[in-house]
Design a protein with these regions (language model features):
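Alpha-helical, largely C-terminal catalytic domains
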Residues: 1-117
Length: 117
């Protein structure tokens, strides 16, 4: 992967640090999408031995990328999400996966498909 592609993708991921969610932290401020993803990753790691039947590497991938589309769309709370929002989110995910060449982009498309299921 060339440097421009790598840095471009990381720049997009960085937006998740600035995009806030509808939920609040225990300190009373809005949680960023990146903070939400981090905590979910920690949770998945902590319980990985409790679910030996699961492919925990896949669970970690799903946790890592499940809200990546929000770097483009912003947070849309699940309880407010419409069919049009889901379409927009899918388009954003395709745009994001398209930033990565070859197998890496295909892998991300697979992850996004599974997240939507």
């Amino acid at each position: 992967m060339d440097h421009d592609t790598l840095l471009g993708f990381l720049g997009l991921a960085e937006k998740l640090k600035c995009n806030t969610r509808h939920s609040w932290t225990s300190s009373g401020r809005h949680e960023s999408v990146a903070e939400h993803v981090y905590r979910l990753m920690v949770f998945a790691w902590l319980v990985r031995d409790e679910f030996p039947e699961l492919d925990m590497d896949r669970v970690m991938e799903l946790a890592l990328f499940h809200d990546m589309g929000e770097a483009v769309t912003g947070d849309i709370p699940a309880f407010e999400k419409t069919g049009e929002d889901e379409k927009t989110e899918g388009e954003a995910q395709e745009e994001i996966a398209g930033l990565l060449p070859g197998p890496r982009g295909e892998k991300l498309r697979e992850i996004f498909r599974e997240v939507r299921e």
